[in-house]
Amino acid sequence: MRAVDGHRYWGWPMWPEELREPTHAGVQAFEQAHAGLVEFHAWLQWLADEQLGEAQALGRELGLPIGLYGDYAVGVNPSGSETWSDQALYRKGAGVGAPPDALALKGQDWGIPPQDPHALIAASYRPFSNLVAANMRHFGALRLDHVMALFRQWWVPVGLGSIAGGYVHYPLDDLMSVLVLESERHG
């Protein structure tokens, strides 16, 4: 929508109702009506992926033993493609942040939607595995931003501030196993 109507629609929560659900017939109709634009943006994604792969290969050819070093973010944009395409995985009504401490007396709310650990388990960790694999694709090393998020995350109720938040625990052993598996797959 953004590419079609300029900045009128900043993310899927602001799209017309029939486009907010990926399986709605309106999405297929939009794809057909704007096939050239959809293909152009898919091509841009492909091109960026190709260039990242070439940069990794060049780094290795030039003697960098690891090549590119990537960064796996703690979360995703609440109006981005991840939350649109897998809405059941992300909890509405909460954000990820940090509890009150000496550096931030009221805590922090990063505005990042948390993944529901129960939904992650129900999906056999495929969303996490796929995201890790995609992030490892062109990197020789991958830094996990806030690695503690594999163990627990501070969830902040929307509109109530971080002080009203609490820790939600995640299945650390299972998530670490996925990381080990994907690390082995990617060398």
Where are these regions (language model features)?
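Conserved, well-ordered alpha-helix/loop/beta-strand core segments that scaffold catalytic motifs
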Residues: 41-73
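Alpha-amylase-like alpha-glycosidases and glucanotransferases acting on alpha-linked glucans and related
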Residues: 1-49, 75-187
